[in-house]
Amino acid sequence: MKKIIKTISYLLILLIADFIVSNLYFNKKEFWKYDRLLDYYWRVSSNIYHHGFLEYVDVIEPWGFSLKKRLVTNSIGFRDFSIREISKETKKKRLLLIGDSAIEGAGYDYEHTIGGLLQNHLSEKYEVLNSAVGSYSPGIYFKKINHYIKEGYTFDKAIIFLDPSDIIDEMFLNFDEDGNFIIDKSGKSSFSNFLVNNFLIFRTLLRVSDGVESLKNFLKLKYKASKKFNKNYFDTTNEDTMYYRMTHIDRSAWTFDNTIFKNYKIGLQKSEKYLNKLIKLLRDNNIEINFILYPHPSQIAYEDLYHQPYWINWAQKNNINLISLYPEFQGNNKRKIIFDTFIFGDLHWNKKGTKIIFDSLINKIDF
C-alpha cells in the first residue's frame, strides 16, 4: 500500500511540475505549436447558414500536409485581399462567387485563388465578393445568399461552382422544424482539451498517437494502391499511393462507383431542391447566373457516370447557363494531368490548376 501511495505521490509531483513548466516555459516555444490543436476561432458556426468566417480577420492558417495561407476577411466575413468595409450597394457591378473550399482557396494566399485572380482581373468593372467556405453545399449556398440579399446587399452576376463532394456534404446537413440548421457542437471534452493544452506529457502522447495513426492509414492506403495497380506492395511508390488517394477518396469516387455511397441519390435530390431555391432567388433579384461544373481527380481518371450527366440535364430543364470545365482537364496521360494541376495527394487545384480554371472562366463568361 505504501508503494502505491508513494508512486501516486511521485506522479502527482511530476504532473504538477509538468503543468507549471508547460505554462511558464514550454507553451512559448516553437515545438509546442501543433496545428491540430490550433484554435481556429475565425471559423464560426451559424444558425442561419451553418458556418462561415468571422469578420475582420487577418491570420495565417495551416492547411493540409504542409501549406499555410494568409486568410483575410472583410466586414461581412467573406475572404478578401484586405480587411475592408463592404457596402450594401456599389457603383461598380458586383460579382458574387458561390462555392466550397476550392473557391475559398485551399492552401494558398488570396492572390493565387480563383477569387483573387478574378478580383484582380475584373477590378475596373466589378467588385468581386467571395462567399465560399470549405464544406459548403447547396443548402448552405441558398441560406447564405438569401441572408445577405435580405440584409440589402445587391449583386449583378453570380457564379455557382459545384463539385462531387458537395453532393455528399449536402446529405449531412440537418434542419429543425423552422428550417434552421442544427449545428453539431460535439467534439473533444473540455477535460481532454485541458490536458493537451497544459501538460507536455499529454501533448506528446497525442502527437505520437497521431503519428502512428497517420502511418497506419498510409500503409493501408499503400496496400489498396498495390492491389489496384497490380504491383508488389514494396514496389508501390509514394506517387502510386497518393494517386490512389486522390482518385479514390469516397467523397468524389461515388461518381464512378455507386457502391461507395449507395444513397448518393438522396444527396443529388437534396442538392437539386436547394439549387432550385437558389436559382429562383437569384432570378427574382435580377442576378445573372453562371453554373460551373468542375472535376476532381476521380472524374479525370474515370468516367463520371452520375454527377455531370445529372446536372447537365437539370440545367437544360431550367434554362441555366452551364459551363463544364471537365474538358480543360482531358488528355491521354491522366496521371500527369492530375499531378500537374492538383495539390499532391489532395482534391484541390494547385496554382497551375487554378490558373486553368481562371482562364476558362474569363474565356467562357461575358464579363
Where are the regions that the model predicts?
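Loop/turn elements at helix/coil->beta-strand transitions in domains of secreted/extracellular proteins
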Residues: 92-93, 124-126, 153-158, 283-290, ...
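Structural beta-sheet core signal
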Residues: 97, 160, 291-293
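Serine-dependent acyl-ester chemistry module
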Residues: 164-315, 325-333
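Catalytic His-Asp segment of secreted/periplasmic serine-dependent ester chemistry enzymes
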Residues: 301-367
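Membrane/wall-proximal cationic-aromatic binding patches
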Residues: 26-121, 233, 237-257, 309, ...
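Short, amphipathic alpha-helical "lid/cap" segments that border enzyme active or binding sites
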Residues: 138, 142, 268, 272, ...
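Conserved SGNH/GDSL esterase-like catalytic core that processes O-acyl groups on lipids
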Residues: 104-188
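Hydrophobic membrane-insertion alpha-helices, especially the h-region
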Residues: 6-22
